[in-house]
Amino acid sequence: MKYVLSLHQNSRRGVILFATGLIILWGSAAMAMALRSPAFKQNGHIPSKFTCEGEDVSPPLAWEGVPNGAKSLVLIIDDPDAPDPKAPKMVWVHWVVYNIPPATKSFPENAGKAGLPRGTVLGLNDFKKTEYGGPCPPIGRHRYFHKLYALDDTLDLRSGTKSQIERAMQGHVLANTELIGTYQKGDR
């Protein structure tokens, strides 16, 4: 009887440990960061309003699942297909935004300087500006990666470039997510 009781207790303990593990795993999956836009879907067409052929304003973006312990967020939008998607030679940076307060959940359309939360810093893009520069592909359909990072620190940089920010982020990324949109000149 003692053997059966011991086996029963061990089984119960195993079930409890298994259930606890499932709760931890399920909780982690539920907390994954996600980035979305009401203007376009993942791998979808970016409306011309947000490009050089339209108003050239930043699209609305919303995110969730920023991990506890995050001290800042970084948003980078770039195009890995420049200048020609059949023979890409460079990654073109369209927008760099960092030191976004972690409680921030979204950017409105045309966030610009006035629509960004206090403390947020705009970095230098490849247009040599500290503002959003929309898609304007010279050849073919390009992909535009909207990458959001949660960091365990803030970045001590003034109008940093993408490469400076990526170096400063090393070892500080808690989580990241991305949203990809596409655009080709003439699309509406």
What are these regions (language model features)?
Residues 1, 6-7, 92, 140:
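Intrinsically disordered, low-complexity regions enriched for glutamine and histidine
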Residues 30-188:
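N-terminus-centered regions that define maturation/targeting leaders and the start
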Residues 3-18:
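Bacterial N-terminal signal peptides that target proteins for export
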Residues 16-27:
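Bacterial N-terminal signal peptides
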